[in-house]
Amino acid sequence: MTYGTYRAKPARGKGRGDRRAGARGQVLALAAFSLIALCALVGLAADTGYFFDYKRKMQTAADAAALAGAEQLRRGGNGNGQIVNAADAAAASNGFTNNVSGTGIQVHIPPGSGYYTSDGSYVEAIITQTRPTLFMGILGLQSATVSARAVAGVQDSPNCIYALGQTGTGLATNGSGSSLSAACGIVVNSSAASALNAGSGAVFGTSVAVAGTYSGSCSSSEPSGCRTGVPPQPDPLAQLADPQFSGCDFGAPTPVNVSGGVVTLNPGTYCNGISIGSGASVTFQPGVYILNGGGLSVSGNSTIQGTGVTFYNTAQGKYSYGPVNLTGGTLGFLNAPTSGPTAGILFFQDRTIIPKSGKSSNVIAGSSNLNFTGTFYFPTTDLTFSGGGQVSANYTIFVARTITVGGNTTLSANFSSLQDGNPIKKVTLAE
């Protein structure tokens, strides 16, 4: 009997199944790894966005801290303590308080790094804080340190003439030949149509910014010329501290009246002011002259001179305010102090004085020839130059409610040669 050859069928299911199971395992492992990687990327993106936003907020706080410290420096803050306190307070108001929630704030004067490391007019603020991560903790990164740095400094303002009044004509030149020429910027705060009225005179500044509009000859070094519609600027000397005094050193009950002769006056409080006339020659010794009522009046071809002097014009108690009038051919040589609380300030009017029509205008007139070095600060009263006088100096700065130049008068303003720069300062971010 013949039997056929038997061939067994291969066991297909087991071998292929093992291979398929292995492949599925590899896919699952790859998928799991990819999912972890994707989660890590998502977590990294989320944490990066979170920390970027947080650093932006911290940078805002650092900027505010540096600016506040520099502003305190501009105001003459005594010692680093006041500057540090101002910077810390500004940072806290922006959500970052020193030694709270792991926040550290460092304030350096001068900055500890960067371009201004040797300049004591700059303040550096550094804020650091360690923050927990949102998602990166699954990869072992539990926290990250965020930091922000800013540097702000005190710089010279580019402006040296301010007409602060916000109504009517703030700056005017009246009469042919009258001019105001400033080797610096001019600011006119009035929003009136005739805020700057050059009339038949001329006004020039390196820049001219007018809240309202102007008429007549107005020019500047800027390509755009005299600018209009500019927002009003604050009083640039608002931080200047008023001199303190009590009682009367001179002039009570009778005002100090110098009529002729050669006289030397000493600093102190002059109740009822100072009046000089009849060709007198007066020398003011260095220091601060408090004019409590009565003001300062010089006339009759008199001569006045003084170096390192400041005149503070006020009216307290029973004394009535009087303006500053230099008229009648006065010949004057007056220089402001170069150091101390009133450095760079020649005339300083009490800000609380309320102007009265016809009684509060400060006048320099009558062919007076004056050489001044210092700042004329009359924030609430008017300042008028007229009568063909020539007013010039190494530097002069004018801040008044209104400023008028008339009667063939030439008025120059410049602070370029002043050793410590413009007494009017501004605070700006530098780094």
Locate each region found by the language model.
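Short, ordered "entry" segments at domain starts
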Residues: 129-247, 356-399, 403-408
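Short amphipathic secondary-structure patches
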Residues: 2-9, 13, 52, 56, ...
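Sequence/structural signature of small/polar-enriched beta-strand/turn repeats
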Residues: 203, 210-215, 221-233, 295-355, ...
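N-terminal single-pass transmembrane signal-anchor helix
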Residues: 19-50
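N-terminal leader/signal peptides at the extreme start of proteins
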Residues: 1-24, 29
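Solenoid scaffold repeats with emphasis on beta-solenoid/beta-helix
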Residues: 171, 178-181, 194-197, 201-203, ...
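Short, low-complexity, Pro/Ser/Thr/Gly-rich segments in the mature regions of secreted, periplasmic
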Residues: 242-258, 415-431
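Feature marks extracellular polysaccharide-active and adherence modules
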Residues: 164, 187-189, 199, 206, ...
